[in-house]
């Protein structure tokens, strides 16, 4: 699946998706940073199978505010 980029509160995030045996895995990272947060969407119940991409993107965008990000530093 193609990567997705979105912005929240002035911060740009990049998401890469991979399909694994038991779930779709989303690796969400702030643009330009090496560290990623991993979110899993289990098959059969973690997303809408009629529109997988849109469902995974919506889940990632909803998860971002609740993930344990390091404080943003601006120089």
Task: Map each language-model feature to its residues.
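Short N-terminal "domain-start" leader segments
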Residues: 1-21
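Exposed, low-complexity/repetitive linear segments and helix-based recognition motifs
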Residues: 6, 11, 30, 45-48, ...
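A short, structured beta-strand/loop element
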Residues: 14-42
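Mixed-charge, Lys/Arg-enriched low-complexity segments
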Residues: 35-75
């Amino acid at each position: 699946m193609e990567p997705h980029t979105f912005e929240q509160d002035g911060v740009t995030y990049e998401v890469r998706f991979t399909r694994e045996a038991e779930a779709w895995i989303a690796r969400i990272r702030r643009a330009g940073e090496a560290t990623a947060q991993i979110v899993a969407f289990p098959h059969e119940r973690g997303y809408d199978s009629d529109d997988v991409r849109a469902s995974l993107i919506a889940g990632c965008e909803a998860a971002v505010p609740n993930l344990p990000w390091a404080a943003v530093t601006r120089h």
